[in-house]
Curated annotation (Swiss-Prot):
Belongs to the NAC-alpha family. NCBIfam families: archaeal-type nascent polypeptide-associated complex protein. GO terms for molecular function: RNA binding. This is Nascent polypeptide-associated complex protein. One of its GO terms (biological process) is protein transport. Homodimer. Interacts with the ribosome. Binds ribosomal RNA. Contacts the emerging nascent chain on the ribosome. Residues 6-75 form the NAC-A/B domain. SUPFAM superfamilies: UBA-like. The gene is nac.
Length: 116
């Protein structure tokens, strides 16, 4: 497309504007996370991010090294939630919250809920 593979950046910017394309770097980005269907996520620390507008649609280009993080598993099951709710005489929602706060410790969650 371009002889010698080189092009003046100013010419490229002008050409992009003529085609209805805009691009703008976004500064100060600390972290970008892309959450995947399987519960894992791609995490970019201190990436370079560019917002591009092409024909009234916005696109974001993220450049940097991605790290894949596996989904965090709860340290307790739905059966644990039911047991705590039953033993403490509270709703399953309250039981789940107590289990989250205690890191899945059933006895501690029950004692906290009964102490309230």
């Amino acid at each position: 497309m371009f002889p010698g593979g080189k092009i003046d950046p100013r010419k490229l910017q002008r050409l992009m504007r003529e085609m209805g394309m805009e691009q703008e770097p976004i500064s100060g980005v600390e972290r970008v996370e892309i959450h995947l269907k399987d519960g894992s996520k791609l995490v970019f620390e201190k990436p370079q991010v560019i917002r591009m507008k092409i024909m009234n649609q916005e696109f974001y280009q993220v450049a940097g090294k991605a790290k894949r993080e596996k989904p965090e598993e709860e340290p307790f099951t739905d059966e644990d939630v039911k047991l705590v709710a039953e033993q403490a005489g509270v709703s399953e929602e309250e039981a789940r919250k107590a289990l989250e706060e205690t890191g899945g410790d059933l006895a501690e969650a029950i004692m906290r809920l009964q102490g309230e």
